Amino acid sequence: MLALYGTEVASRLLLGTARYPSPAILAEAVRQSATEIVTVSLRRETAGGRNGGAFFEMIRTLGVRILPNTAGCHGVSEAVLTAKMAREVFQTNWIKLEVIGNHDTLQPDVFGLVEAARILASEGFEVFPYTTDDLVVAERLLDAGCKVLMPWCAPIGSAAGPLNLSALRAMRAHFPDVPLIVDAGIGRPSHATTVMELGFDAVLLNTAVAGARDPAAMAGAFAKAIDAGRLAFTAGMLEPRDMAVPSTPVIGKAVFA
């Protein structure tokens, strides 16, 4: 089980709800993924008007927990205001905090992120910060009151997969007791398996599933890949060696003179 701010979930796959071909396909992807947590943008809920309300009701019928996000926010005050509005709309203290610093890469503004996290944590929010793999920033976020970290492995929507395995490995080693959820940049199930084999606690997906030819089938593929990576990590994988090691014992081998 994975514990996030005192809530335990069995699934280690978190699923975004944007960019699906239709609500019905999204619903089936959620079912096939077996996720227990979906992210929802306040902008999607409010901008859709009556349709936005129908979307929210559809999500609620799936029996999953909603993690609102501040997607599209480019400053501290905007992110904080959006988080407060999301708490009212979705009736939860959970917030996936995004403060974007660059339009092209959608890289987090880590300075604004830490400031916004501190403000929100002081007001009772349980913050899931979208951040980089920088250890110093991670320390600042924990100091600000975050109990979960969500580092990217590549730019949002890039499908590039983990670009810096050394940094991700270092983050896992440096924060052995902090829930770490890889957020952004995953493109293939094998990417998800790779980061789970490093010991990360979960993966958040959106574009890799929503943009697939068959989103529901891809959601199922990712669910299996994440489970496989987690099982491999807990089972204890062999470390690579430079030289061969025979797999067949030589004791008792016949000797022909």
Curated annotation (Swiss-Prot):
UniProt name for this protein: Thiazole synthase
- Keyword rRNA-binding belongs to the record: no
Family matches, as Pfam families: ThiG
Q: Which GO terms describe its molecular function?
A: thiazole synthase activity
State the species of origin.
Rhizobium rhizogenes (strain K84 / ATCC BAA-868) (Agrobacterium radiobacter)
Q: In which pathway does it act?
A: Cofactor biosynthesis; thiamine diphosphate biosynthesis
Annotated localization: Cytoplasm
Any one Gene Ontology BP term:
thiamine diphosphate biosynthetic process
Active-site residues per Swiss-Prot or TrEMBL entry: K96
What is known about what this protein does?
A: Catalyzes the rearrangement of 1-deoxy-D-xylulose 5-phosphate (DXP) to produce the thiazole phosphate moiety of thiamine. Sulfur is provided by the thiocarboxylate moiety of the carrier protein ThiS. In vitro, sulfur can be provided by H(2)S.
